[in-house]
Amino acid sequence: MDYDWLVIGSGFGGSTSALRLAEKGYSVGVLEAGRRFADEDFAESTWQFSRYLWAPILGLRGILRLTPFKDIFIASGAGVGGGSVVYANTHYRAKPEFFENPQWTGLADWEGELDGPYATAERMLGVNMVPFESPGDLLLQDYAASLGKEDTFTRTPVATFFGTPGETVADPYFDGAGPDRTGCTRCGACMVGCRVGAKNTLLKNYLWFAEKAGAEVMADQMVTDIQPLGASDGSDGYTVRTRRPGIFPGRRREITAKGIVVSAGALGTNRLLANCKHSGSLSNISARLGELVRTNSESVLAVTMPDDSLDLWNSVAISSSIHTDQDTHIEVVTYGQKGDAMRYLFTLLTGPGTRWTRVFS
């Protein structure tokens, strides 16, 4: 066997699995379809498509994967570190009513069960509250007051190292065992890729320590198939087939392992397992695969400001929020000064209706 465990995907689930397995002494390989970025490799603006967007068939090998469906457009991460390289650093704990959902409420006391793991994740990811007030926060406060909801205004818990802006210091989180860090400069480009080194991506914590413990992270490895070796239940191990994604078929590999962790995100995991089920490679996969898949219930709305002098970008990606009712949570979001390439994906916000009638509303 090449490894005791192969982890498919290097995002939040994959990085955590890789670290904990490596800490137990297993040999661990991590497969990631995207490339590996150093801080200075990230795009300087969203217009640098080759470093920002993920579409390898077009030669684009950036961090943002856009996946269209009939009624929704999904944004997800690509690259070593998965979603952590492109997300907005925010770390809210689920509200109590989430744990009361009938799909899982009777299975365990989830709020109690997850309290410890929440605390561990917050410590590992360096979660703290945004320590400043930005122009966007003031606008949101005014809007909340106009609705009588000013008491719901709160700053955001984020995985960002603030320190002294632009100043690089020895690791402040793990008694010096982690990488050097640089203080946030409030450029607002967290979701474009943090070129400063202030964003606590998984490369700064879970993956950093997983590699220190011996895990091998292999970038540019798109998994195409998983097959059991010998017994169909996988008790004899697995063969994982990969190829380098790109315009032309890249180098293909076969890697063996005693166990597999599939953690390729909600889209990637379901797509890979469905392909393996339908091809017969993993014929024992449940027919319920893909049911109850959920988004994170967010919609991104664009607002054009008439006055550019407000410097709404001078912040982290998401710095504050309000609740206008029990189910509606509004945040102020920025992509920074050079983050407007996605504006052409937006259109006018209309009321309810059909696909045809809304055009004229």
Predicted regions and their residues:
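Active-site acidic short loop of glycosyltransferases
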Residues: 2-3, 257
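A short alpha-helix-loop-beta-strand transition element characteristic
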Residues: 65-72, 77, 127-131, 149-161, ...
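FAD cofactor-binding and catalytic pocket of flavoenzymes
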Residues: 62, 68, 83, 87, ...
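Redox-cofactor-proximal catalytic regions of oxidoreductases
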Residues: 49-132
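Conserved redox-cofactor binding core of oxidoreductases
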Residues: 109-222
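N-terminal Rossmann-like FAD-binding beta1-loop-alpha1 element of flavoenzymes
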Residues: 5-30
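Glycine-rich loop(s) and the adjacent beta-strand/alpha-helix scaffold that form part
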Residues: 23, 34-39, 44, 196, ...
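Short, hinge-like loop/turn segments at secondary-structure boundaries
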Residues: 46-49, 172
